[in-house]
UniProtKB/Swiss-Prot annotation:
Keyword Cell wall biogenesis/degradation (UniProt): no
Gene that encodes it: pqqA
Pathway participation: Cofactor biosynthesis; pyrroloquinoline quinone biosynthesis
Family: Belongs to the PqqA family.
Protein name: Coenzyme PQQ synthesis protein A
UniProt signal peptide: none
Keywords for this protein: PQQ biosynthesis
Functional summary from the UniProt entry: Required for coenzyme pyrroloquinoline quinone (PQQ) biosynthesis. PQQ is probably formed by cross-linking a specific glutamate to a specific tyrosine residue and excising these residues from the peptide.
Annotated organism of origin: Methylococcus capsulatus (strain ATCC 33009 / NCIMB 11132 / Bath)
A GO BP annotation: pyrroloquinoline quinone biosynthetic process
Covalent link location (Pyrroloquinoline quinone (Glu-Tyr)): 16-20
Keyword Cell membrane attached: no
Length: 24
């Protein structure tokens, strides 16, 4: 499983946003 695709960046961004909203 390689994370060398734009999906990795998108998933990371989505995860950060989700955590930010969840921590609100």
């Amino acid at each position: 499983m390689r994370w060398e695709k734009p999906s990795y960046n998108d998933m990371r961004f989505g995860f950060e946003v989700t955590m930010y909203i969840y921590n609100r």
